[in-house]
Regions:
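N-terminal leader/targeting pre-sequences
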Residues: 16, 20-63, 68-171
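Bacterial N-terminal signal peptides that target proteins for export
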Residues: 1-10
Length: 171
């Protein structure tokens, strides 16, 4: 190849790479019932779903349920403004439900004795695009942490207890 072709080819490849769409992502700030920041959750598209990276602090130790809820509101102290679980397909609750589960259902995570949790979860039933399963649909959603572990089957919320932290998911 001639020396002048290599820079032109490199420029063309760089333009193609940088013009590709980047994966959608967003950060969510979580607050407790008193309005205090208890951490950040990073969301990004991964495969056919959304990766959920938790960086949390000042939470009660133990296992906790976590779900995407349908309404982008987090009015304390009970966070009921977040509405029910995100459920665009009208299914029952629980990853172990024989009838399918809410799109917003996820596995439990554990908070350590110091009140911290750094964990990565995944929700294969949601996305960050623009269809009915998008966490951004209808103006957004909320992500809610519950006081107890989700039993993965009891409708409508897995007996996971009170809502103890909440963050709004928007673009």
């Amino acid at each position: 190849m001639k020396p002048t072709i290599l820079p032109t080819l490199a420029t063309a490849v760089a333009l193609i790479i940088f013009s590709l769409p980047s994966a959608a992502k967003t950060n969510v700030e979580l607050k407790d019932a008193q309005g205090k920041n208890v951490g950040t959750i990073m969301l990004w598209e991964q495969g056919s779903g959304v990766a959920v990276q938790l960086h949390l602090h000042d939470l009660p130790p133990g296992e906790h349920g976590i779900h995407f809820h349908q309404t982008p509101k987090c009015d304390g102290p009970d966070f009921k403004s977040a509405g029910p679980h995100f459920n665009p397909d009208g299914k029952k609750h629980g990853l172990e439900s024989p009838d399918g589960h809410h799109a917003g259902d996820m596995l439990n995570f554990t908070v350590d004795a110091k009140g911290k949790a750094d964990a990565k979860l995944e929700d294969k039933d949601v996305n960050l695009s623009s269809d009915a399963h998008s966490l951004f649909s209808n103006g957004g959603t909320a992500i809610v942490i519950h006081a107890k572990a989700d039993d993965m089957k009891t409708d409508p919320s897995g007996n996971s207890g009170d809502r103890i932290a909440c963050g709004v998911v928007t673009k």
